[in-house]
């Protein structure tokens, strides 16, 4: 059984999708040890409680430095014998302490066809760009923002009559298929 921790900052829909894949047996030999969140009021906490997943709430402002924050996370991760970190809407850059402890063992999903539209509001950037396709990317995490080695991408059309909300739904649907598929192939 491979132990993973999932990091999320917001609603946690990708977190819950992964948990449901584990619970249903579609993601085999994986144990979700805990949800790690950096916001005490994030909706992902409710999703974790619904699935009886332990939650660690650690807000960086509670620590003297980013290094102290990440060292605390590493202590918790090591206590739970976590082997992989899965970022699912975690809105912070991973720093050197976490990267050193989990080198090559941190995955992220991003709602664009990287290297296009890194950072926040990638779907909005694609929508307003005039592009005719966008998609989702799973990549390894490095010290940059959405710059790690790309593992796999899936794409969808941006139709002229799509609203931004419709495009967000299309990309979310891709993410719900892509992330568990990549996790099944990579996390062993």
UniProtKB/Swiss-Prot annotation:
A GO term, aspect molecular function: phosphoribosylglycinamide formyltransferase activity
Binding, N(1)-(5-phospho-beta-D-ribosyl)glycinamide: 12-14
Pfam families listed in its UniProt record: Formyl_trans_N
Top-level division of the source organism's lineage: Bacteria
Residues with site note (Raises pKa of active site His): 146
Keywords for the protein's UniProt record, in alphabetical order: Purine biosynthesis, Transferase
HAMAP family in alphabetical order: PurN (MF_01930)
Binding-site residues for (6R)-10-formyltetrahydrofolate, renumbered to this chain: 66, 91-94, 108
Role this protein plays: Catalyzes the transfer of a formyl group from 10-formyltetrahydrofolate to 5-phospho-ribosyl-glycinamide (GAR), producing 5-phospho-ribosyl-N-formylglycinamide (FGAR) and tetrahydrofolate.
GO BP term (any one): 'de novo' IMP biosynthetic process
Organism: Staphylococcus aureus (strain Mu50 / ATCC 700699)
Enzyme Commission identifier(s): 2.1.2.2
Name of protein: Phosphoribosylglycinamide formyltransferase
Top enzyme class: transferase
Swiss-Prot/TrEMBL catalytic activity: N(1)-(5-phospho-beta-D-ribosyl)glycinamide + (6R)-10-formyltetrahydrofolate = N(2)-formyl-N(1)-(5-phospho-beta-D-ribosyl)glycinamide + (6S)-5,6,7,8-tetrahydrofolate + H(+)
Record NCBIfam families: PurN
Family per similarity comment: Belongs to the GART family.
């Amino acid at each position: 059984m491979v132990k993973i921790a999932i990091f999320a900052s917001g609603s946690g829909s990708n977190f819950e999708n992964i948990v449901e894949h584990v619970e249903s047996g579609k993601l085999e030999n994986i144990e979700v040890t805990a949800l790690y969140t950096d916001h005490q009021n994030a909706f992902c906490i409710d999703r974790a409680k619904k699935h009886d997943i332990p939650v660690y709430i650690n807000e960086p402002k509670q620590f003297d430095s980013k290094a102290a924050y990440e060292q605390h996370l590493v202590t918790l991760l090591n206590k739970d014998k976590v082997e992989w970190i899965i970022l699912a809407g975690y809105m912070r850059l991973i720093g050197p302490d976490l990267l050193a402890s989990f080198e090559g063992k941190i995955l992220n999903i991003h709602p664009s066809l990287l290297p296009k539209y890194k950072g926040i509001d990638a779907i909005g950037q694609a929508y307003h760009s005039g592009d005719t396709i966008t998609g989702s990317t799973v990549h390894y995490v490095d010290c940059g923002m959405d710059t790690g080695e790309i593992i796999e991408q899936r794409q969808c059309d941006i139709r002229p009559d799509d609203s931004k909300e419709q495009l967000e739904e299309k990309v979310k649907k891709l993410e719900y298929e892509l992330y568990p598929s990549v996790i099944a192939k990579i996390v062993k």
